[in-house]
Amino acid sequence: MERKHNPNSWSDLPHDLLNLVFERLSFANFNRARSVCSSWYSASRQSVPKNQIHWLILFPEDNNNKNNSSCTLFNPDEKDKLYKTQHLDEEFAKSVCRATYGSWFLMVDPLFNLYILNLFTRERINLHPVELLWKDYELGVSSRNRMKSRGGNVRSPVFWIDEITKDYVVLWGLRDWCVFYSKKGDTSWNQIPQTPDCYRLRYKDHKLYFQGYFSSFKIFDLSGEIPQQTFDSLVFVDHCHFRRWVLYSTLVVTLTGKVLNVEKMMDCSFTVFEVCSSGRRIHSLGDESILLEQGITVLANDTNGFIRNSIYFNNDCENIEKHTYDMFIFNLETQKTEPLHTFDSSSFQFSRAHWFVPSFTLT
């Protein structure tokens, strides 16, 4: 006797089998699969997709427009698709994103207060007010100009947060004073001594990498209660003949923890040097790519859409047409620059973009 086919059998698949499938999906496909039916949604709560890749979030250009609070999401692996977030609140529309970690965003509101926001769950963590820090730090300018300059005083903010416990640490530099940090449970901002003239900060695996304006380079261990300095040196790189063409330099921490100094040239090319060693120039990143603004490298493969041995950066070079709203890729092997994606500026305009890793917090 022929067995009658049950068209609804897909909704009754064992959760163990569904979990094996969910773990292999990209974030976009995982999100689609978990919305198929209640049974699949229930199974998805026990899974986290392994193919977690970086997406690009594009913030609207007019932060003063309270009706313009949705953002556009771009997945490098789906170049023909753009996603829109739901409209967020007015405060978010007027805030500026300064850093990302996973699906969490470090935001600065119009009064220069800091908070951490999860884009997908809408969880929010308000950080300690910084008003007392501004009062303690006298700029020697008029009160009006001091208020205008405060936003720029939050230099190179970085942070880390645990998706489950919500333990976190936030760090940033205050002009030529020092680096401040705050962890979950702290009642105020804390100082890290001997960190004046902060230029660039990076944070990875409980280590803070500090670069000063005058070539100083330090590493701090933040795994304990109090930050401990573990390394102190000058950043030495063999770049004397490039110096006059350098727009700026920035630190990058690779997947293996190697520290690089990346210099951006006036023609939008790049040079890469090692830090903490001979300062030799690097000509290949192997199978990794640099996300310049985030100061990290990612593995480049067919799954995540990134091109190996390349640098992904924002459009801020004078010889690239303004207002094209593009992100760019510089290939270290070919020494050529090309757009990551040409966004249609007639449909939307954005002021800045950040890489992040979309994820759900499943409980």
Curated annotation (Swiss-Prot):
This is Putative F-box protein At4g22170. It holds the Pfam family F-box. It comes from the Eukaryota. InterPro entries: F-box-like_dom_sf (IPR036047), F-box_BR-signaling (IPR050942), F-box_dom (IPR001810), KIB1-4_b-propeller (IPR005174). Residues 7-58 form the F-box domain.
